[in-house]
Each structure stands twice: as structure tokens, then as C-alpha cells.
């Protein structure tokens, strides 16, 4: 079933869009089934769960951290994380850099923007992000690589609102790229879109979609 679901989602994706299979709260067996069907990129949002899965699953899996990351947990994910999707403060970015330096590696990160009409979502406002980038301190952080932006649309049935939010992030991505990352080939990821809204996200320019329930079914809490 998982393999069929995966095949269906992948068949809908343009060449430039990659799938992050959101495996949080799902058992190793579910991930193994998706892995056997060819999926290599998986997303987790709990540090302890991600660490345990990393230890016991194939080492060529690319693990993405997609949850809200607390500064005191960074050291546990830095050794093996391929991409952190939710950097929502300079403090967090600096701490990732510090732990990455200790691990002697460079960690790929996305800056999370708050685009939804919901207080529960994390992220920089557009102005806060501009201020942080303009200040330039991030340029001194040699063990992180800012690879793009991430955002979550409002959880609503209003397709027009979702489209508007994704399009606003997409145009902000173009602004940030032009102003601060014009020569950075690595700044190319726009992570937006989940099981219920990834079609709208892709239409707005997403390069990474985060899909869980449409592949694995509902989660086991």
C-alpha cells in the first residue's frame, strides 16, 4: 500500500520537485517499505525518534528535520541531518553553526517564514528575515549553509488563501535570492506544501514537498 501511495505522489511531481516523505510517528517497517520502493528522503520532527531511526535504518537515507528545533537538542541531530527545514531565529542558526563546528561539518538549513494566518506556526516575518540577512552576521557562520526558505500555509479549505500565501513566499524567495544569495548556487530550495496542499505549492514554485499521511496513512500517536 505504501509503495503504491508513494508511486502515485511521485507521478504527480515535476522534475524539479523533490519529495520529503514525512515518517514521524510511523514505525521503521513503514519507512523500510517506502525505502524498498525507492524513497531516500525522509522527514522527522522529534529529535529522539529521528536519532533512533537513524541508528537502525539504512545509512543512505537522507534525513530532514522538519519540526520546531530547540537549541538544546541541536547537538543530537547535527551529526547526521541532511537539511534542517525550520530555522526561525538567528540564535538557532548560530547554535547549529556552533554544534556543526564541533562535529567538523557544514549543515544545510532553510529559513522558516511565517506566512499563515495562525499564531501556532513558527517562523520569521518577512521584515525580521530581511533585518537578519541585512545585518550580515550570518556570513561569519562557516559551518552552516543557507539553502533556501520554508513555510507552512494556513490549515484551511480556502484554496485562494493557500495560493496567496505560497505565492507571497515564492516572491520573497526571489527577493532574498537576488539581494543576498545571487551568487550562491546552493540557495535554491523552497520547501512548501504538505499532503493537503502540495499541488498549490508546486504551482507557486515549491522545490521540496513534505508529504506524510498521503503516503503512510494516518499517524500512530
Describe the residue ranges of each PLM region.
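Conserved alpha/beta-domain cores
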Residues: 1-196, 202-204, 216
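Short C-terminal tail/terminal secondary-structure segment
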Residues: 211-221
